[in-house]
Regions:
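DNA replication initiation modules
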Residues: 2-118, 142-146, 152-153, 160-161
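Short glycine-rich, low-complexity/disordered patches
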Residues: 19-26, 116-125, 175-185
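Residues in well-ordered beta-strands of folded domains
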Residues: 30-33, 125-129, 149, 167-169
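Residues in flexible loops and secondary-structure boundaries
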Residues: 40, 134-136, 156, 174
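Short, charged low-complexity linear segments at domain edges
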Residues: 110-135
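Segments forming glycine/polar-rich beta-alpha architectures that bind adenosine-containing cofactors
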Residues: 137-141
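Short, small/acidic-rich helices and loops at N termini and domain boundaries
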Residues: 143-185
Length: 185
């Protein structure tokens, strides 16, 4: 969980506006940065420490608090586009629509997965209790959707409705066994 907080802080010192929003995904840590196909990748190796993890994290009031992490300018526009593409889950037919008409995100949290998320002081922000960071789960669009930045959360990096929130927490391990193209309903 330290990687994203440290990477964002370092990027803010160097110029976060030059970073792609996916730069801070933990899986990026193990790969070389990309470059255009017709360009030469240039890098240099230094055997001295570049910066201190403890020092970077110490620059935060509380590095566990996701709301303190620097953001790439315009990254919120990506979230708005993602939300705009989502169909209102209460208008869906079948069990998913029925579930979402019966339970909002917060009602589903309380009824089916109590204790998995804790409300923070900031309206619409929750903390996934199975992780180390705080305030990384955001409720959107009048309690219809949740998007989680918590890396240990089964809903991490997914915009989910109430049905999918519960499904991923209670039965997400079954997805590994499902064949590609299996409908969720």
């Amino acid at each position: 969980d330290e990687y994203e907080a440290a990477a964002r802080k370092l990027a803010s010192l160097l110029g976060i506006e030059f970073c792609d929003p996916t730069t801070f995904d933990a899986e990026r840590l193990m790969y070389w940065p990309s470059c255009c196909s017709d360009s030469q990748y240039v890098y240099q190796v230094y055997d001295n420490p570049f910066c201190s993890l403890k020092g970077l994290l110490g620059m935060y009031g509380d590095w566990h608090d996701v709301s303190q992490w620097p953001q790439v300018p315009g990254a919120d526009a990506i979230e708005r586009r993602r939300l705009a593409k989502q169909e209102d889950p209460t208008t869906k037919r079948g069990i998913i629509g029925a579930f979402c008409r019966t339970y909002s995100i917060t009602q589903a949290m309380e009824k089916f997965i109590p204790g998995m998320y804790e409300e923070t002081d900031m309206q619409g922000r929750y903390t996934y209790t199975g992780g180390e960071t705080t305030g990384g789960a955001l409720v959107y669009d009048g309690d219809l959707f949740l998007y989680s930045y918590h890396s240990h959360d089964p809903c991490c990096r997914q915009l989910v409705n109430a049905f999918d929130l519960v499904r991923l927490h209670m039965f997400g391990d079954k997805d590994d066994e499902a064949k590609e193209g299996t409908p969720v309903n």
